[in-house]
Amino acid sequence: MTIKVGVLGAKGRVGQAIVEGVNAAEDLELVASIDRGTPLEKLVESGAEVAVDFTQPASVMDNLEFCIAHGIHAVVGTTGFDSERLAKVEGWTQKEDAGNVLIAPNFAISAVLTMVFAAQAAKFFDSAEVVEYHHPNKLDAPSGTAVHTAQGIANARQEAGLDAMPDKTEQSLDGARGADVDGVHVHAVRMQGMVAHEEVIFGTQGQSLTIRQDSYDRSSFTPGVLLGVREIASHPGLTVGLEKYLGL
């Protein structure tokens, strides 16, 4: 059975890769390409069952409210979701005949595994820091992936009953130690030539562990997005993180 898909942000760099992936899949049909100036009603008129959103933080909430209210499932790679926004989306999904929502900080399978592996490793090391690298046109810093990774590390450390990480450093310049995400330092690099990359560095007495993930092309997000499109109907309400669709 073919799943009818609409792509929001279809002319963006990631959106173009998603459109190409949907068109190449025998079990998916692209029925709507939505960009600035295109009314969201096109999703309803085309019979879209799932909408993929790679737009902007400023517009994603309106997009989600529309999709959920019209019973259209939404696979979302747009960033900018804090706890308040997530709570609002979850509330929308609880209404009768609402669409389901998958929000993932990263759809690259390698990035998802990096987050999972980092959380597993966290309890074995005294120190952990996250470094993310992106192209200079990325709008936010640190990335949602880096924040999600740091939160996973912090949660794992808390569950293991670990003390705060050792750090007696006094900053001579503000920001020298990066951002603090629940006690985990996160550093954002913006550099020409980069796409999306992350390093998680762990240290303890006499040893260290580095977990690194690299997305060299935006097509790296396509397999994860298509997995979400295929599976979202069987995951009611709001799901945050692709790892839950992977059984991790």
UniProtKB/Swiss-Prot annotation:
(S)-2,3,4,5-tetrahydrodipicolinate binds at residues 135, 144-145. Catalyzes the conversion of 4-hydroxy-tetrahydrodipicolinate (HTPA) to tetrahydrodipicolinate. Belongs to the DapB family. The keyword NADP applies. NAD(+) binds at residues 9-14, 77-79, 104-107. Keywords: Amino-acid biosynthesis, Cytoplasm, Diaminopimelate biosynthesis, Lysine biosynthesis, NAD, NADP, Oxidoreductase. It comes from Corynebacterium aurimucosum (strain ATCC 700975 / DSM 44827 / CIP 107346 / CN-1). The active site is at 134 (proton donor/acceptor), 138 (proton donor). GO terms for biological process: diaminopimelate biosynthetic process; lysine biosynthetic process via diaminopimelate. InterPro entries: DapB_C, DapB_N, DapB_N_CS, DHDPR_bac, NAD(P)-bd_dom_sf. It is an enzyme of class 1 (oxidoreductase). It is found in: Cytoplasm. GO terms for molecular function: 4-hydroxy-tetrahydrodipicolinate reductase; NAD binding; NADP binding; oxidoreductase activity, acting on CH or CH2 groups, NAD or NADP as acceptor. It comes from the Bacteria. Transmembrane segments: none annotated. Pfam families: DapB_C, DapB_N. This is 4-hydroxy-tetrahydrodipicolinate reductase. CDD domains: DHDPR_N (cd02274). Pathway: Amino-acid biosynthesis; L-lysine biosynthesis via DAP pathway; (S)-tetrahydrodipicolinate from L-aspartate: step 4/4. Gene3D superfamilies: Dihydrodipicolinate Reductase, domain 2, NAD(P)-binding Rossmann-like Domain. Its EC number is 1.17.1.8. It catalyses: (S)-2,3,4,5-tetrahydrodipicolinate + NAD(+) + H2O = (2S,4S)-4-hydroxy-2,3,4,5-tetrahydrodipicolinate + NADH + H(+); (S)-2,3,4,5-tetrahydrodipicolinate + NADP(+) + H2O = (2S,4S)-4-hydroxy-2,3,4,5-tetrahydrodipicolinate + NADPH + H(+). GO terms for cellular component: cytosol.
